[in-house]
Design a protein with these regions (language model features):
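Short, aromatic- and glycine-rich surface loops/edge beta-strands on solvent-exposed regions
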Residues: 92-103
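Short Pro-Gly-centered beta-turn/loop motif in secreted/extracellular proteins
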Residues: 86-92
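Short, ordered, surface-exposed loop/turn motifs in non-cytosolic proteins
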Residues: 54-66
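Glycine-centered loop-to-beta-strand initiation motif
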Residues: 77-86
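Beta-strand-rich domain onsets/edges
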Residues: 27-46, 50, 68, 75, ...
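N-terminal secretory signal peptides that target proteins for export/translocation
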Residues: 1-7
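Bacterial N-terminal signal peptides
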Residues: 12-24
Length: 125
């Protein structure tokens, strides 16, 4: 009787973790573990892509959207995984999506408050 209960619990736990994995894996988290960071420096936005072990994507495209998800422009990254662009149309915030191909994407959101605070912080320095 105890063996049946143990087996049933094991099967239930296995199924639970299998379903969690199926939901989590396609999310792109496993896809090269691409990370993107964006911040404001004065009147420019700096973007940096990162891969595991300190590596950088050598090629890719950033897509910059406003807070309403309207594409503002796109730009190629530099071979060191960075890009920058003038800070414009930021009143509704910005979403910076980095696409390095083969479905490997990640994004960073700069809210209007983030942008305002980072600009003010830079002016104090």
């Amino acid at each position: 009787m105890a063996l049946k209960l143990y087996t049933g619990c094991f099967i239930a736990l296995f199924c639970f973790f299998f379903v969690v994995f199926l939901v989590w894996a396609p999310s792109g988290v496993l896809a090269h573990q691409l990370s993107v960071f964006a911040w404001v420096e004065g009147d420019n936005v700096k973007v940096q892509g990162k891969l595991p072990k300190g590596k950088h994507p050598k090629q890719g495209t950033i897509f910059v959207y406003d807070g309403n998800d309207k594409l503002l422009f796109q730009k190629q990254i530099h071979p060191d995984g960075t890009a920058s662009f003038p800070l414009q149309n930021w009143e509704t915030g910005l979403k910076i999506l980095l696409d390095i191909g083969d479905g490997h994407q990640s994004y960073w959101i700069l809210t209007p408050l983030d942008i305002k605070q980072q600009r003010e912080e830079k002016m104090k320095q």
